[in-house]
Curated annotation (Swiss-Prot):
Gene that encodes it: feoB
Main location: membrane
Key words of the record: ATP-binding, Cell inner membrane, Cell membrane, GTP-binding, Ion transport, Iron, Iron transport, Membrane, Nucleotide-binding, Transmembrane, Transmembrane helix, Transport
Positions with a binding annotation for GTP 2: G35, V36, T37, V38, D39
Annotated function: Probable transporter of an ATP-driven Fe(2+) uptake system.
InterPro entries in the cross-refs: Fe2_transport_prot-B, Fe2_transport_prot_B_C, FeoB_GTPase, G_FEOB_dom, Gate_dom, P-loop_NTPase
Subcellular location: Cell inner membrane
Gene Ontology CC: plasma membrane
Recorded topology in the membrane: Multi-pass membrane protein
Organism the protein comes from: Helicobacter pylori (strain J99 / ATCC 700824)
Stretches assigned to the FeoB-type G domain: 3-168
GO molecular function: ATP binding; ferrous iron transmembrane transporter activity; GTP binding
UniProt superkingdom: Bacteria
Name of protein: Fe(2+) transporter FeoB
């Protein structure tokens, strides 16, 4: 079977990822804003006895290296191994797109043109003469539409053309040299694109979509109220996360608790019962139960992304962001940080200014990722009534964003000084969300969350259980056996009283074993570090394990708080937290989690994007100092207020 390697190239926001999803049934992230693809991705499919590997390159307006994403595309086209170029253009904005097409033609590589968003062009009254366009460019032009499954157009034909073009005897230029980007060269490509577009386009423009966009923008992009409208949308999303997801989460939590209690009651081997019930079910179950809240959060953000609203918010906030040393383009990485810090760090590649890029990288971690949400929900649910929980959750996220801005300003004034870049961006048209794309966005992120729960969160929970069980406290065990024997021989006690007394002795033994274990001893030292905020050793240990993944914080607490609580009528997880942790300590714990260093995977990505291990060290010091300082302030402020 022959393999065909296709380089997928196009300007930002032309639907490259949507097209590749339609061709291969992949689930690449799709968004109605520039910078969704920030590194090359590849998918493979079989078509007519050929394995077609499509490499989705970052969107670029021209073949230069002003930004990291543009450099990735240029370097691959010059040095990468591929058989042909599939150039995707926006049919509703052909002239601008053809400037890049003209550059690609000058590489003398086999090329195919996909006229994407053909359905939208038709709706807007734009008619493109594909035969004449093919003659002008000397390549086959295929009209395509990939926005939804129902509206797909010519995806099979496009694959046929890829195979046909690959099979042609024309030779490729093996020594690809991307054309220079001097002003004179840029002007030449722009003029060429303008001439070709005029010759192939006949318009009977239907201005309805533009009128609708203008009317919507008059409201959403209002100079005074636009920001408050955006905050309103975010408040609704967080409130619904707690309102809708919270009910399902409580049901799942109760289900896992029943399962855990059942295992501990029916498994004869006490250690095995504790491992499965407290370690695996208590740890992993505590994490999985928060999935419904995360699904609602992902749904809301995906809707805002696919409609094109997020790009407008970037423009709306540009003035504010510049005052704090950031850039309008910083908004997309920052808002992406609400989902996961890893793609957020990678999304900073769209920033051209080195200092602005580094500032954005350093403050992304203050935008609370979805992995922190279960921690917030657990503690907010423990200390605040359900009626106000959504508002408190919203305030947590807003506080994180405000601190990110303040820290960005401090970094700008002290470390990363220099001129700021002007902000020029393309405003995409408002589009009705593709429910299929929204579904796949939620599906892939939820699946990733569950994979974490089933892999290293599971491993982490088991390790925490073992380290919290061993070594045993032999002296306490000896005392327990002696006192248990005395209780059993005491004729003055009823059977019910004996059972209750034995349970109390067992609970006391478990607590002593826990303090004598590896985790207990290590936690005693950590407790001294966090003593000013009155964090006990269990909270302290969970913060350390949270560096592996923030989801592990909840699973660690689930393991440590379930051990030593052998009462079958024990309260739910929130009740245990409320009983064991003071309100000031709980608030301080939330604040520390908000600001301390991201998970291991995100930290590695940060180091790669920032430029080396020294920046990771700077990030650790920076985030730890910020987290400790704000946590301390929150603790004493809450003590005064409560």
């Amino acid at each position: 079977m022959k393999e065909i390697i296709v380089a997928l190239v196009g300007q930002p926001n032309v639907g490259k990822s949507s097209l590749i999803n339609a061709l291969s049934n992949a689930h690449l992230k799709v968004g109605n804003f520039a910078g969704v693809t920030v590194d090359k991705m590849e998918v493979s499919l079989i078509h007519k006895d050929h394995q077609i590997t499509i490499i989705d390159l970052p969107g670029t307006y021209a073949l230069n290296d002003f930004t990291t994403e543009e450099k990735v595309t240029k370097d691959f086209l010059e040095k990468g191994q591929y058989d042909l170029i599939l150039n995707v253009v926006d049919s509703t904005n052909l002239e601008r797109n053809l400037a890049l097409s003209a550059q690609l033609l000058d590489t003398n590589k086999k090329m195919l043109l996909a006229l994407n968003m053909w359905d939208e062009a038709k709706k807007e009254g734009i008619n493109i003469n594909t035969e004449k366009l093919s003659q002008e460019l000397g390549v086959v032009c295929v009209p395509t539409s990939a926005r939804s499954k129902e509206d797909r157009l010519n995806t099979e034909l496009l694959l046929d053309e890829i195979v046909r073009l690959y099979s042609q005897n024309t030779t490729n230029n093996e020594n690809i040299k991307v054309p220079s980007q001097s002003f004179k060269e840029s002007l030449k490509y722009s003029q060429s694109a303008q001439r070709i577009a005029k010759s192939v386009i006949s318009e009977n423009k239907q201005n309805a979509s533009f009128e609708h966009t203008y009317k919507i923008d008059k409201i959403l992009m209002h100079q005074r109220y636009g920001i408050f409208i955006f905050l309103g949308f975010m408040f609704i999303i967080f409130s619904l996360s707690f309102l809708i997801g919270g009910g399902v989460q409580k049901a799942l939590e109760e289900g896992f608790k029943i399962l855990s209690d059942s295992i501990k009651e029916n498994v004869a081997n006490e250690d095995l019962a504790s491992l499965v019930g407290d370690g695996i079910i208590g740890g992993v179950g505590a994490t999985v139960s928060f999935l419904p809240l995360i699904v609602v959060l992902y749904f809301g953000i995906s809707l805002l992304e696919t409609t094109g609203y997020m790009s407008r918010v970037a423009f709306l906030l540009d003035g504010i962001l510049h005052k704090f040393g950031l850039h309008g383009k910083s908004f997309i990485p920052l808002i992406t940080g609400f989902g996961c810090s890893v793609p957020a760090y990678m999304a900073t590649r769209t920033l051209q200014n080195y200092n602005e890029r580094l500032i954005t990288l350093f403050v992304i971690g203050f935008m609370s990722c979805s992995a922190r949400l279960p921690i917030y929900v657990l503690f907010v649910g423990s200390f605040f009534p359900s009626s106000s929980a959504g508002f408190v959750l919203f305030c947590i996220y807003i506080l994180g964003a405000v601190v990110a801005l303040v820290m960005a300003k401090l970094l700008k004034l002290s470390v990363f000084k220099g001129q700021t870049e002007s902000f020029i961006m393309e405003m995409p048209k408002y589009r009705f969300p593709s429910w299929r794309m929204v579904y796949f966005s939620i599906y892939t992120k939820s699946l990733s969350y569950l994979k974490k729960a089933g892999t290293y969160i599971l491993v982490g929970a088991i390790l925490i259980w073992f380290m919290s069980q061993y070594p045993k406290n032999d002296a306490a065990m000896k005392t327990y056996k002696q006192e248990s024997l005395l209780v059993q021989k005491n004729a003055n006690l009823s059977s019910e009283a004996k059972e209750e007394k034995l349970k109390e002795l067992k609970t006391e033994l478990d607590k002593k074993n826990l303090k004598n274990s590896v985790v207990g001893r290590g936690g005693a030292y950590l407790e001294k570090v966090f003593n000013p905020m009155d964090f006990d050793w269990r909270l302290s240990v969970s913060l350390v394990t949270g560096f592996m993944a923030k989801e592990v914080v909840v699973s660690t607490l689930g393991v440590l708080f379930s051990l030593g609580d052998q009462n079958e009528k024990s309260d739910a997880f929130r009740e245990i937290i409320r009983k064991e942790v003071s309100v000031p300590s709980g608030i301080a714990f939330i604040v520390f989690v908000m600001f301390y260093i991201p998970c291991f995977a995100a930290t590695i990505t940060f180091g790669r994007e920032a430029g080396g291990i020294k920046f990771v060290a700077y990030l650790f010091i920076f985030t730890t100092v910020v987290a400790y300082a704000f946590s301390l302030i929150a603790f004493y402020a809450t003590q005064i207020l409560v």
